[in-house]
Swiss-Prot record:
UniProt xrefs under InterPro entries: ARM-like, ARM-type_fold, Clathrin/coatomer_adapt-like_N, Coatomer_bsu_C, COPB1, COPB1_appendage_platform_dom
Described function: The coatomer is a cytosolic protein complex that binds to dilysine motifs and reversibly associates with Golgi non-clathrin-coated vesicles, which further mediate biosynthetic protein transport from the ER, via the Golgi up to the trans Golgi network. Coatomer complex is required for budding from Golgi membranes, and is essential for the retrograde Golgi-to-ER transport of dilysine-tagged proteins.
Short name of any one Pfam family annotated for the protein: Coatamer_beta_C
Protein's organism: Oryza sativa subsp. japonica
Protein name (Swiss-Prot/TrEMBL): Coatomer subunit beta-1
Length: 953
C-alpha cells in the first residue's frame, strides 16, 4: 500500500500451499485453471505477498498463451510485480525477458492485444524496459484502427512525462502534432491534444489557434480539453491573444454538450469581466437552469449565478426573470436558492415584474400538493414580504391576494402572511382602509391561534374610523358566538331528595357564528349550528381543525388568545368613545365588551376545561375590565398611542440594522491615489474589439477599486502554528493546521537537532472523536540539523471537537532501539466549523421545537454585567445574536437572547441565554444549546463551559 498502484482487490492471506497450487495450475494446459491461478496470484501480490519464484513460471507458461483473458491478466500481473531489486534499485535481469513478448504484442495482428499492451505501457515506469519498445509504439500511430492509435498516443504521453522521458522520445511533441493533423477519432485527438497541453503548451496553443474557426465543430471531449488549455494559458502574464481565446470560448457557449457549455461559461467569466462577456455567461447559466432536469445540476448552476451576482450585480439584474423561471422545479432547495438570488437582484425597474410573477406562483400553490404547496407558499410569502418592505409601492398589488391565505392550513405560511400585513399596514398608510376591510372580511377563515392574535392586534391598532371600529367589534363578537360560553344543566335538581346524589353531567353549549359558504360561493343568511359537548374539545392552541375559529380556540383552553381578545376589545371601545358621537352607543359597546371579558373569566375559573386560566391572562383580562370601568386620559394615551409607537420604533430599528449590514457588506478596499489610470477613449484608438475594450476597462476599474488586491494573511497564519515538541527534544516539530470543510491538513515541520542522521523517522498520528486519518505514515531519513515537511490529511465527517495525538519514532546508528518523542495533543476547535448565520424568528422557534438534542449549561462566571456576559459568549462561540439590540438595552437585572450559527456541514446550532443578576451582584441562569445532532450540542456546550468563566479573554 505504500507504493502507488492503480489496482486494489481485497484477498485473505495466502499460504505456501496456495502458492504451490498456483504454480501447478500455471504449468498445466487447462486455460480456465490458468485464468483462475493468475487471478489468485494477482490478488496475493496486491495484498502484500511476494511470490518470488512465480515470475519464471509466468514467463515460461503464461507468456506464450494466445488467450485474450490470460494476456490481459498477464499485463495486470506485470503491472504490480516488483521489477526492481530492493537493495540496488536496478531493474531485475529477468524482466528483460518480457520485452520481446511486449514487442510481439505491439506488432500482433489482433487489435485488442495491441491496444491493451499500449494501455499497459502507460503504467510502466522503467526506462530500461520501455526503450526497446519505442519504435513499435511509434509505428502504431499509423495503424488503421482508432483503438490502437488512441492508446499509442496515451503511451507516448505517459512515457514523455517520465523523469527521463524526453531522452526516450526527444521528438514526441512533433510526432504527436503530426498525428493530430490527420486524426479523426475524438478520443485519439483528445489524448494527443492533452499530451501537447501538458508537455508542449506552445504547440497546443498553436494547434488551437490554427483551428479556432472549427473548435465549435470539434467533439465534446476535445472541446473540454480546449477550455482547460485556455484557462491555463490565460493565467500567465502574457495575455496578448486573450481576445482570440474569448472568441473561441463564446463560440463554445452554443455547443450541444451541456458540460462543455457549463465549463465555457465559467472560463469566460474567469477570462473577462466585461459586461458583454458576463451577460453571455449569465444567459448561458440560465439556459442550463431551464434545460437540465437534474436538481444537483440546477443547484450547482445557481451557485455560479450567486458568484456572478456578488461581482457583477448590474449585469445580473437583466437576467432576473430568466432565473425566476427555475421556480418551475418542484425541488424545495432549488426554489429557495432561486428566491434568495432574485431578492438580491431587485431594482425599482424590475420589482413589479418580479412581484407579479411571484403572485402567479402563489395562486398556483392552491392547486398543487397541499403539503409541498404550503411550504412553497411560505417561501413565496416571505419573498413578497421582502419585496414590499424594500419597495413599498408594490405592496398594494399583492397584499389583498395574500390576505386570502390568513386561514391557510400551513400555520407557518399563515403567520408569515399576517406579519407581512402588520408591517405593510404600518409602512403604507394609503392601504390601511382597504386592508382593514379585507382583514375583517377574512377574519372568519383564520384557524391558528398565533395568526388570530396578530390579526386582533392589527384590528385594535389600525381600526380608526367609526365604521371600521364598529365592524371590528361586530366581527369579534360573531366569532366568539353566544354568551356565556357554557350553561349548566339543572336536570339533577329534579331528582328525589331521598335518592343518593348522582354526579351531575355538565354540558357545554357551544355556538358557532362562522359563516357558511354555499355551493355557489355566497354566504348563507341563516345558521342554526349549535353543538353540545360533554366536555370542552381538547384542541391545542395553534393546531388545525376544520371547525376551529375564535370561539373554539378559547374553548380549547387558549387563554392567551382570550387575553388578546380582551385587549383588542378594550382598544376598540376606547377608540369608539372618541369617534362615536352617541354616548349611549359607546356605553352599549363597552357593556358588551365587559360581558365578553367576564364570560371568559368565568370560563377560565370553571371546572369544565382541563386547565384553568393562567395567572398572567387572568390579570390581563381583569386589567381590561377595570380600565373600561374607569378610564383616565393617561391610560387612554398609553393604550391608543404607545403600543403603535413601539411597533413603529421596532420597524425603524429593523430597517436601520438592515441598512447598516448592507453598508458593511458594501465596504471595499480602494487603491492608492497615485495609481495609474487609463482612459477609455484613448484605449479605443488601439484597434481593440468592443469585447476586448470593455474587458480592459473592467480590469482598470477592478484595479482602481482594489478588487485585485488580497489582504496578506501571513500574520494570521502564524497564529495557527502549534508547537508539538519541546526545544530540548532531539527532534523538534511544529504543525500548521489548515481546516477545510471536510478535512484537516497538518503541515508538520520536523527538524533534526542532533549531529546524527535519523533513519526510519516516522510521524505516527492517532485521532479521538469523529476524525479519521487518510494516509498511512511513511519513513524518512533526516540528515543532521536538517528539516523535513510532512503533510497529514485527516477526514472530518461532523461538527465535533476532536483530538489528534501521536509521536515521532526514529532510529540512529548508535542506539539499537527505536527512540520515541511524544507530541503535544492538537485539539480541533469546533469554532473552525461554525459561522454566524441569520434566520427568521419563526424558523428559530420551529427548529427549537423540532431539535431533540439539548445541552443545558449553568452560568458560572466572574462577569457581573449581563450585557457584557452576552457579548463575551457571542465572541467566544462565533455566533450571531438574533435578538435585536433594542431588546437588550437598559438595566433590568436580567437578559434573554437567542444565538444562531450554521456549521460547514449544514447543521444548525441554536443557543438561548437566560441570565439574571442576583442580589450579591453575581449572574445566574442557564445557557441552553439545541441541535439536530449530539456532537455539535456537546462540543458547543464544552466550549461555552470553558470560555464563560473568564472575562474577555
Amino acid at each position: 500500500m505504500e507504493k502507488p498502484c492503480t489496482l486494489l482487490v481485497h484477498f485473505d492471506k495466502g499460504s505456501p500451499s496456495m502458492a504451490n497450487e498456483i504454480k501447478a495450475d500455471l504449468e498445466g494446459s487447462d486455460v480456465a485453471a490458468k485464468v483462475d491461478a493468475m487471478k489468485r496470484a494477482i490478488m496475493l501480490l496486491l495484498n502484500g505477498e511476494t511470490l518470488p519464484h512465480l515470475f519464471i513460471t509466468v514467463v515460461r507458461y503464461v507468456l506464450p498463451s494466445e488467450d485474450h483473458t490470460i494476456q490481459k491478466l498477464l499485463l495486470l500481473y506485470l503491472e504490480i510485480v516488483d521489477k526492481r531489486d530492493v537493495a540496488s534499485g536496478k531493474v531485475l535481469p529477468e524482466m528483460i525477458l518480457i520485452c520481446q513478448n511486449l514487442r510481439n504484442n505491439l506488432q500482433h495482428p489482433n487489435e485488442y492485444i495491441r491496444g491493451v499492451t499500449l494501455r499497459f505501457l502507460c503504467r510502466l515506469n522503467e526506462p530500461e524496459l520501455l526503450e526497446p519498445l519505442i519504435p513499435s509504439i511509434l509505428a502504431n500511430l499509423d495503424h488503421r484502427h482508432h483503438f490502437i492509435r488512441r492508446h499509442a498516443l496515451s503511451a507516448i504521453s505517459a512515457i514523455y512525462r517520465l523523469p527521463h522521458g524526453d531522452q526516450l522520445l526527444p521528438d514526441a511533441p512533433e510526432v504527436v502534432e503530426r498525428a493530430l493533423t490527420g486524426e479523426q477519432d475524438a478520443s485519439a485527438r483528445r489524448n494527443g491534444f492533452l499530451m501537447l497541453c501538458a508537455c508542449a503548451q506552445e504547440r497546443a496553443v498553436a494547434y488551437l489557434l490554427t483551428n479556432a474557426e472549427r473548435v465549435a465543430e470539434w467533439p465534446d471531449l476535445l472541446q473540454m480539453a480546449a477550455v482547460d488549455l485556455i484557462r491555463k494559458v490565460c493565467r500567465s502574464p502574457n495575455r496578448a491573444d486573450k481576445g482570440r481565446y474569448i472568441k473561441i470560448i463564446i463560440s463554445l457557449l452554443s455547443a450541444p454538450n451541456s458540460a462543455v457549455v457549463y465549463e465555457s461559461a465559467g472560463a469566460l467569466v474567469s477570462l473577462s469581466s466585461a459586461p458583454t462577456a458576463v451577460r453571455a455567461a449569465a444567459n448561458t447559466y440560465c439556459q442550463l437552469l431551464s434545460s437540465q432536469s437534474d436538481n444537483n445540476v440546477k443547484l450547482i448552476v445557481l451557485d455560479r449565478l450567486h458568484e456572478l451576482r456578488a461581482s457583477h450585480r448590474d449585469v445580473m439584474v437583466d437576467v432576473v426573470m430568466d432565473v425566476l423561471r427555475a421556480l418551475s422545479s418542484p425541488n424545495v432547495d432549488v426554489r429557495r436558492k432561486v428566491l434568495d438570488l432574485v431578492l438580491d437582484l431587485l431594482t425599482p425597474r424590475n420589482v413589479e415584474e418580479v412581484v407579479m410573477y411571484l403572485k402567479k406562483e402563489v395562486v398556483k400553490t392552491q392547486a398543487g400538493d397541499l403539503e409541498k404547496g404550503g411550504e412553497y407558499r411560505q417561501m413565496l410569502v416571505q419573498a413578497i414580504h421582502s419585496c414590499a418592505v424594500e419597495y413599498p409601492e408594490v405592496a398594494g398589488s399583492v397584499v389583498h391576494l395574500l390576505m386570502d391565505f390568513l386561514g391557510d392550513t400551513n400555520v407557518a405560511a399563515a403567520v408569515d402572511v399576517v406579519l407581512f400585513v402588520r408591517e405593510i399596514i404600518e409602512t403604507n398608510p394609503k392601504l390601511r382602509v382597504s386592508m382593514i376591510q379585507r382583514l375583517i372580511d377574512t377574519f372568519y377563515q383564520i384557524r391558528a391561534s398565533r395568526v388570530c392574535s396578530c390579526a386582533l392586534w392589527i384590528l385594535g391598532e389600525y381600526s380608526l374610523s367609526l365604521s371600521e371600529v364598529e365592524s371590528a367589534i361586530s366581527t369579534i363578537k360573531q366569532c366568539l358566538g353566544d354568551l356565556p360560553f357554557y350553561t349548566v344543566s339543572e336536570e339533577g335538581e329534579s331528582t328525589d331528595a331521598s335518592k343518593p346524589a348522582q354526579p351531575v353531567v355538565n354540558s357545554v353549549t357551544v355556538s358557532s357564528r362562522r359563516p357558511v359558504v354555499l355551493a355557489d360561493g355566497t354566504y348563507a343568511t341563516q345558521s342554526a349550528a349549535t353543538e353540545t359537548a360533554i366536555s370542552s374539545p381538547a384542541v391545542a392552541p395553534g393546531s388545525l381543525s376544520s371547525t376551529q375559529n375564535l370561539r373554539s380556540l378559547i374553548l380549547s383552553g387558549d387563554f392567551f388568545l382570550a387575553a388578546v381578545v380582551a385587549c383588542t376589545l378594550t382598544k376598540l371601545v376606547l377608540r369608539l368613545e372618541e369617534v362615536q358621537p352617541s354616548k349611549a352607543e359607546a356605553n352599549k359597546a363597552s357593556t358588551g365588551a365587559l360581558l365578553i371579558m367576564v364570560s371568559i373569566l368565568q370560563l377560565g375559573q370553571s371546572s369544565y376545561l382541563p386547565h384553568p386560566i393562567d395567572n398572567d391572562s387572568y390579570d390581563r383580562i381583569v386589567l381590561c375590565v377595570r380600565l373600561l370601568c374607569n378610564t383616565g386620559d393617561d391610560v387612554r394615551k398609553v393604550w391608543l398611542q404607545s403600543c403603535r409607537q413601539s411597533f413603529t420604533k421596532m420597524l425603524a430599528e429593523k430597517q436601520f440594522r438592515e441598512t447598516e449590514e448592507m453598508k458593511a457588506k458594501a465596504q471595499i478596499s480602494h487603491a492608492q491615489p497615485d495609481d495609474l489610470i487609463d482612459f477609455y477613449h484613448l484605449k479605443s484608438r488601439r484597434g481593440m474589439s468592443q469585447l476586448e475594450l470593455e474587458d480592459a476597462v473592467q480590469d482598470d476599474l477592478k484595479a482602481a477599486t482594489g478588487e485585485f488586491t488580497k489582504d496578506a494573511d501571513d500574520a494570521n497564519r502564524l497564529n495557527r502554528i502549534l508547537q508539538l515538541t519541546g526545544f530540548s527534544d532531539p527532534v523538534y516539530a511544529e504543525a500548521y493546521v489548515t481546516v477545510h470543510h471536510y478535512d484537516i491538513v497538518l503541515d508538520v515541520t520536523v527538524i533534526n537537532r542532533t549531529k546524527e542522521t535519523l533513519q526510519n523517522l516516522c510521524l505516527e498520528l492517532a485521532t479521538m472523536g469523529d476524525l479519521k486519518l487518510v494516509d498511512r505514515p511513511q519513513n524518512y531519513t533526516l540528515a543532521p540539523e536538517s528539516s523535513k515537511q510532512i503533510r497529514a490529511n485527516i477526514k472530518v465527517s461532523s461538527t465535533e471537537t476532536g483530538v489528534i495525538f501521536g509521536n515521532i519514532v526514529y532510529e540512529t546508528s548508535n542506539v539499537m532501539e527505536r527512540s520515541v518523542v511524544v507530541l503535544n495533543d492538537i485539539h480541533i476547535d469546533i469554532m473552525d466549523y461554525i459561522s454566524p448565520a441569520t434566520c427568521a424568528d419563526v424558523a428559530f422557534r420551529n427548529m427549537w421545537a423540532e431539535f431533540e438534542w439539548e445541552n443545558k449549561v449553568a452560568v458560572n462566571t466572574v462577569i457581573q454585567d449581563e450585557k457584557e456576559f452576552l457579548d463575551h459568549i457571542i465572541k467566544s462561540t462565533n455566533m450571531k445574536c438574533l435578538t435585536p439590540p433594542s431588546a437588550l438595552d437598559g438595566e433590568c437585572g436580567f437578559i434573554a437572547a437567542n444565538l444562531y450559527a450554521k456549521s460547514v456541514f449544514g447543521e444548525d446550532a441554536l443557543v438561548n441565554i437566560s441570565v439574571e443578576k442576583q442580589a450579591d451582584g453575581k449572574l445566574s441562569g442557564y445557557i441552553r444549546i439545541r441541535s439536530k445532532t449530539q456532537g455539535i450540542a456537546l462540543s458547543l456546550g464544552d466550549k461555552i463551559t470553558l470560555k464563560q468563566k473568564g472575562g474577555s479573554s
